[in-house]
């Protein structure tokens, strides 16, 4: 984690399947941004939080932004805020996810 030197990128900030769609012409659209400057990996991490996108999305994305070493561990860090937020708002199974994330982070 300490060797990761991300470049600030303007990210969507809430990129999950509920915020993407197709317009009348058949073009893909994204909406409901919560944009901020961050490591581009935060958007990809968010896409994996609630089921993920199709394989082709990731293949095309990683042609532009190749996967960097340690990404799989950073997914947990980048999604921790979102899991805490959902646990605060909805409780339920999100509380167990928070516990699991804490265990994974402590074991890194």
Regions found by a protein language model. Give the residues of each.
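Active-site Asp-x-Gly
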Residues: 4-10, 17-73
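Short helix/strand-capping connector loops at secondary-structure junctions
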Residues: 77-86
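Short alpha-helical
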Residues: 52, 82, 93
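ATP/Mg2+ or Mg2+-diphosphate-binding catalytic cores
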Residues: 86-108
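Short, well-ordered beta-to-alpha junction loops that form the rim of enzyme active sites
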Residues: 13-15, 80
């Amino acid at each position: 984690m300490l060797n990761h030197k991300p470049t600030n990128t303007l990210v969507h900030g809430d990129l999950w399947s509920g915020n993407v769609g197709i317009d009348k012409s058949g073009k893909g659209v994204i909406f409901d941004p919560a944009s901020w400057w961050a490591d581009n990996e935060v958007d990809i991490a968010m896409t994996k939080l609630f089921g993920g996108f199709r394989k082709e999305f990731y293949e095309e994305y990683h042609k532009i932004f190749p996967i960097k070493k340690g990404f799989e561990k950073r997914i947990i860090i980048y999604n921790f805020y979102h899991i805490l937020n959902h646990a605060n708002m909805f409780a339920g199974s999100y509380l167990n996810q928070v516990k699991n994330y804490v265990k994974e982070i402590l074991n890194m």
